[in-house]
């Protein structure tokens, strides 16, 4: 079954997922009910009521009922997920640990838990607990053996000023103009997620054209971010009022032009080029000299692609590590060769070989 760029479905998430083709979606983002178990109104110090989550869809008669619901929707989600796909589930301390058990019991393989640190959290008005300033996201592949899930590591590193992206993300709550309001001026959905959060999830774990399923679509944050980033989406929501807000919101989204969607490619996906190939191609010759960037270590190239420094011999990586007394070394960036413009890393030569493979 081929999906159009936007598919919005009104109905029960379990029933509607069971009606979708098996193994048809690349990514699932789920923001299920939190089962907050509120015993009454939450009040501020001035006795005004906190606009908390007290909607009927968040109410379950027991933990057992919530667990049953969780396993049913996760089973339906797993059926429609491609073997190389992945799932994200977000929750608070009220539900995420119960959801995590179900995720593992049903055969998913947890890759990371992400802490969404809210830079502007709601305070604990009673002063009886720590201010709840984060939520947890579980990112999991379909199974332990699934190794080809999408992870745009280098794109995330570039987005983070060339520093490896960590598992704690500081993103503010959804406020201001981004917050969807009803006709009465009140927020249309109590747990609307910031689009920046979904932008990062989608950018990191999908490719343009992928199909993203959100079984708890709400007011369409996943759909808005997916449309903006050139991904297809399926949104399922049982509350008709939320869907009307979602449709109006998504209609206003202007997609990024397809030619502007390219991100940093993963070096792990590039063809492997042994250093010996550089010698075979004549880009370096046996007897040529390699230098570290500081000029403190000098190596000689041998015909088989190994190098020598004094009595030491081995690969560019092994010798680079030994001369630095380091546990490991990336020889491609450590060793340099002479050019008319000065020293250049031998990784430049590897790039030349790879360019010829395309």
Curated annotation (Swiss-Prot):
Has an N-terminal methyltransferase (MTase) domain linked to a C-terminal DNA-binding domain by a 10 residue linker. The MTase of one monomer recognizes, binds and modifies the target strand while C-terminal domain of the other monomer binds the non-target strand. It catalyses: a 2'-deoxyadenosine in DNA + S-adenosyl-L-methionine = an N(6)-methyl-2'-deoxyadenosine in DNA + S-adenosyl-L-homocysteine + H(+). Residues 31-34, 39-45, 93-94, 109-110, 122-132, 153-157, 187-193, 315-317, 330-332 bind DNA. It comes from Caulobacter vibrioides (strain ATCC 19089 / CIP 103742 / CB 15). It holds the Pfam family N6_N4_Mtase. The keyword Hydrolase does not apply. Opens a bubble in the DNA at the recognition site, allowing precise recognition of the sequence and ensuring enzyme specificity. Functions only in the predivisional cell. Responsible for 5'-GANTC-3' methylation in the cell; methylation of hemimethylated sites generated after replication fork passage occurs late in the predivisional cell, near completion of chromosome replication but prior to cell division. Induction: Transcribed from 80 minutes in synchronized cells. Its EC number is 2.1.1.72. Residues 1-260 are annotated as: Methyltransferase. GO terms for biological process: DNA replication; methylation. Residues 261-270 are annotated as: Linker. Belongs to the N(4)/N(6)-methyltransferase family. It comes from the Bacteria. Homodimer. Residues 272-358 are annotated as: Non-specific DNA-binding. DsDNA binds at residues 94, 164, 179, 267, 272, 350. One of its GO terms (molecular function) is DNA binding. GO terms for cellular component: cytoplasm. This is DNA methyltransferase CcrM. InterPro entries: DNA_methylase_N4/N6, DNA_methylase_N6_adenine_CS, RAMA, RM_Methyltransferase, SAM-dependent_MTases_sf. Rapidly degraded by Lon protease prior to cell division. PANTHER family: RNA METHYLASE-RELATED (PTHR13370), TRNA (GUANINE(10)-N2)-METHYLTRANSFERASE HOMOLOG (PTHR13370:SF3). Gene3D superfamilies: Vaccinia Virus protein VP39. Residues 259-355 form the RAMA domain. Keywords: DNA replication, DNA-binding, Methyltransferase, S-adenosyl-L-methionine, Transferase.
């Amino acid at each position: 079954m081929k999906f159009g760029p936007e598919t919005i479905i009104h109905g029960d998430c379990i029933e509607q997922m069971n009606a979708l083709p098996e193994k048809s979606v690349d990514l699932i983002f789920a923001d299920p009910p939190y089962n907050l178990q509120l015993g009454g109104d939450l009040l501020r110090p001035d006795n005004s009521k906190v606009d908390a989550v007290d909607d009927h869809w968040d109410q379950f008669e027991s933990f057992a009922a919530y667990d049953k619901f969780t396993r049913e929707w996760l089973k339906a989600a797993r059926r429609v997920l491609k073997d190389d796909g992945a799932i994200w589930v977000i929750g608070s301390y009220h539900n995420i640990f119960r959801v995590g058990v179900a995720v593992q019991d049903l055969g998913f393989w947890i890759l990371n838990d992400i802490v969404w640190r809210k830079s502007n959290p709601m305070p604990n008005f009673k002063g009886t607990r720590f201010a709840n300033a984060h939520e947890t996201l579980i990112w999991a592949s379909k199974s332990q053996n699934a190794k080809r899930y999408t992870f745009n590591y280098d794109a995330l590193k570039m987005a983070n000023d060339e520093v490896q992206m960590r598992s704690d993300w500081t993103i503010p709550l959804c406020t201001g103009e981004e917050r969807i309001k009803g006709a009465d001026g009140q927020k249309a959905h109590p747990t609307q997620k910031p689009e920046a959060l979904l932008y990062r999830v989608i950018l990191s774990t999908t490719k343009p054209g992928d199909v993203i399923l959100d079984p708890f679509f709400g007011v369409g944050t996943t759909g808005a971010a997916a449309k903006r980033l050139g991904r297809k989406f399926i949104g399922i929501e049982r509350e008709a009022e939320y869907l009307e807000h979602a449709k109006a919101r998504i209609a206003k989204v202007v997609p990024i032009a397809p030619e502007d969607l390219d991100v940093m490619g993963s070096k792990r996906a590039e063809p492997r080029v042994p250093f010996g190939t550089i010698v075979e191609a004549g880009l370096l010759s046996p007897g040529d000299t390699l230098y570290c960037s500081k000029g403190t270590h000098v190596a000689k190239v041998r015909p088989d692609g190994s190098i020598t420094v004094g009595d030491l011999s081995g690969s560019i990586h092994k010798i680079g590590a030994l001369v630095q007394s380091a546990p490991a070394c990336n020889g491609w960036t450590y060793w340099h060769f002479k050019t008319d413009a000065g020293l250049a890393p031998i990784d430049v030569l590897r790039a030349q070989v790879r360019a010829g493979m395309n």
